[in-house]
Structures are given as C-alpha cells and as structure tokens.
Amino acid sequence: MQTGKDAASAAKAGMEKTKANVQEKAERMTTRDPLKKEMATEKKEDRVAAAEMGKRDAKAQHAAEKQGAATTGTGTTGYGATGNHTTF
C-alpha cells in the first residue's frame, strides 16, 4: 500500500511540475518585459520546489504510517462473533 501511495504522490508532484512549466511558458510568451519573464521563471522554480517538498513529505508520512501500523498491530485480521472473516 505504501508504494501505491508513494506513486500517487509522485504523480501528483509530476502534474504540479508540468502545470508550473506550462504556466511559465505562457507567461513568458505573453510579455516582452525581461523582468516579468524572470519573475515567471522564479515562480515556476518555487512551484517545482514546493511540489518536490510535498512529495518527499508525503513519502515520509507514508513510511511513518507503515512503521506505526507495524508496531501497533493495526491492520491485522481476525474473526468476528458470527465467524465471518473481518479486518480490524
């Protein structure tokens, strides 16, 4: 499950990076002012860095959740009162 969550985090970060790149290109194409072009590039770099940080934070959180589940025993299976297989 952790790898699935990590893959989802990586995909989300990838989408955010792509959005940042496309937005930067659009902003650079619509202006002739070098200062605005530089600001668009800096904004893109900030968004890309934030996406990477979010991905790393999510990955660390998933690892902590997995570690916590292993030590507390959550996620184990058992049998209910009716004898049916249940998951706690």
UniProtKB/Swiss-Prot annotation:
It holds the Pfam family LEA_1. GO terms for biological process: embryo development ending in seed dormancy. Disulfide bonds: none annotated. Residues 14-65 have a biased composition (Basic and acidic residues). Induction: By abscisic acid (ABA). It comes from the Eukaryota. Accumulates in developing seeds and drought-stressed leaves. Residues 1-88 are annotated as: Disordered. Belongs to the LEA type 1 family. This is Protein LE25. It comes from Solanum lycopersicum. The lineage of its organism: Eukaryota, Viridiplantae, Streptophyta, Embryophyta, Tracheophyta. The gene is LE25.
